[in-house]
Amino acid sequence: MDFGKNTPQRPGGLKQCFVSALLYCTGEMQQLHTHMQDKFFPLQLVEGCLRGISRVILLNNPLSGALILAALLLESPWQALLGMLGLLASTFTAIILGQDCEEVSSGLYGFNGMLVALLMGVFSSAGDWYLWLLLPVCLGGAATTFLSSSLAPVLDRWDLPVSVFPFNTVLLLYLVCTGTSNPFFPNHPAQPPGAPESTNHTQLHVPQLLQGVMLGVGQIFACGTVGPSLLILVAVFLFSPILAVYALLGSGISTIAGLSMSVQHSFLYSGLSGFNGALGCMVVGVFYILSWRTHLLSIANALLSAYTDIALSNLLGVLGLPASSWAATLTGTLVLLLTGKNLKEYRIPTGKPDPVCFGYLLITASPKLHLL
């Protein structure tokens, strides 16, 4: 009789095991983070670096970081090397300065260094495997940690994240200092998106435009091909399906904004018009609880980020400088400073777990899983 009673429970038990494994691998993977606290330093460093990679795109999941690293390797091994070197430089600088161990192990001091390194490689006109570039990559990565450490106490007063202010600042200073004719670190000049096309393109290719929406997510990591962009989108989905939708939604909105401003088709097709909108939309998804009000706010912020990016790109492009992610950074900060009571009640304090992560959605959908 006992055997007969236990038999019907097996499918339910397998389902619970599957959901438990899914919960362990998605969201912030807090159980793994707790488990790694007493492990050897190299293991903690690996986890912290993978989290730092995912922090670039507002995630906090080491598996997502591993997928993004695979995407970078697929896009360009040289770019992946530069990114990891910048990440390590900024992380070790934080350790040397004695920054909070929990913040270091969560990757909060790594992602700005990685972004600086990636964009130094993108704008370098010396080609791949130009080893002299490793020097500014290390120095730039370390500089982002100094800026992060300095800005954090100021921004904490308003419950604001440091975000990528250090990355944008260091990259801009580097490109202004080196210029396009530097004998050691020459760079490509950035082109304004509103500049005339080299040839007369009047017909819009819809398939390429739709592909550009996908590439807008990949361009957050300077990936301009479909395969790596898909891997990055999967990494976002692993952490939060809602954020993956927001990333595509923001990129699509930003692409439409680019069309309305007659942006060069090459910017639309390559995703360069979409990544600021994707980030702007995702910021709301990370720092606000999902509701119809915050959904409208995410759309509005994506539009604001897109038009701000076009304006800054046209302004800085005259000087041969990129606007990088200044637009999403500035508009995202303004959105987090909103004081209206109908939105303020949905605001998630900085540093709190993300309620749109995969694990949270599964738990709220199945209250019995709290017992697992």
Where are the regions that the model predicts?
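N-terminal signal-anchor module of multipass membrane proteins
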Residues: 1-99, 215-222, 231-239, 332, ...
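Loop-to-transmembrane alpha-helix initiation sites
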Residues: 132-135, 158-166, 270-275, 295-299, ...
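Aromatic-anchored segments of alpha-helical transmembrane domains
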Residues: 91-92, 144-145, 170-176, 252-260, ...
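Membrane-interface helix-loop-helix junctions at boundaries between adjacent transmembrane segments
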Residues: 106-109, 113-193
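Central hydrophobic cores of alpha-helical transmembrane segments
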Residues: 166-170, 247-254, 295-306, 328
